[in-house]
């Protein structure tokens, strides 16, 4: 008096016992091949991720070294020295080249203060703009720069609120 499960188990055991050695070897080799293929895909993905991270770090270090130049360009633009002429075109080319590499300038008056992207250098009294609660930016002393999501330099700002 055997149950159907016991009969099925005995049948599969007898099939495994009668299985040809080459079939077992082929199954083992297939499993090895699939495992190696998965390891290779993971390796390729890891290398691509590392390359992207290294590229972003390299661009970030170049931007860090160019920050004084970018600050001078911004000051010249604020003082009206870059309204036209060859220096204006050079400044525009530098900024557009950096934009192509994912460099973004940030920091604007009346935006909410965020300590992860702003560095508050001064606190002053001022009326809060409509729709802004809490601390907000009153003046941008030096803009901040990002490469992707990485903050290269926080925006240096004056805040109120």
Features from the language model and the residues they span:
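Charge-rich, N-proximal long alpha-helical rod segments
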Residues: 1-68
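Structured alpha/beta interaction-core segments
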Residues: 72-161
């Amino acid at each position: 008096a055997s149950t159907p499960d016991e009969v099925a188990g005995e049948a599969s055991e007898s099939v495994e016992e009668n299985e040809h050695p080459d079939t077992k070897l082929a199954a083992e080799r297939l499993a090895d091949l699939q495992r190696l293929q998965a390891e290779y895909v993971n390796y390729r993905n890891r290398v691509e991720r590392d390359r992207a991270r290294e590229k972003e770090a390299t661009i970030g270090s170049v931007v860090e070294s160019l920050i004084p130049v970018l600050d001078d360009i911004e000051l010249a633009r604020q003082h009206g020295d870059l309204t036209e002429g060859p220096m204006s075109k050079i400044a525009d080319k530098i900024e557009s080249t950096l934009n192509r590499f994912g460099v973004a300038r940030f920091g604007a008056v009346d935006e909410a203060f965020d300590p992860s992207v702003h560095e508050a250098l001064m606190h002053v009294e001022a009326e809060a703009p409509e729709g802004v609660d809490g601390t907000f930016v009153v003046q941008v002393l030096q803009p901040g720069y990002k490469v992707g999501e990485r903050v290269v330099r926080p925006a240096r700002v004056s805040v109120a609120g």
